[in-house]
Amino acid sequence: MFAQSVKISSFSEAMKFVDITTKYDGISMHLKVDDYEVDAHSIVGVLSIVDGDKNAVFTANLPENDTALLNDIKPFLPTVQA
């Protein structure tokens, strides 16, 4: 299981994120914020937990050596501020 913190701060970012996840429809993916977990393929689910101040934990059952999805979600990785 792959897990990564992601940052989705707006409606347009949520739409872009779901566009990416729907390209991988056969892979189970979820987003979790606090006690709430939703299907990462669902725009309604993603919008229901989007909070500009909090990161979500993205999980996916990725096949080994599958890097395409990881590359696609790079724009949503939180930036580290010094």
Label each PLM-derived region with a short phrase.
Residues M1-I8:
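Short glycine-/aliphatic-rich beta-strand segments at the starts of folded cytosolic domains
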Residues S28-L31:
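Short polybasic amphipathic segments
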Residues D53-A82:
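C-terminal structural segments of small proteins and small subunits
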Residues S12-G26, Y36-G52, D66-N71:
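Amphipathic alpha-helical interaction surfaces in cytosolic regulatory modules
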Residues I8, V33, A60, E64:
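Conserved residues at beta->alpha junctions
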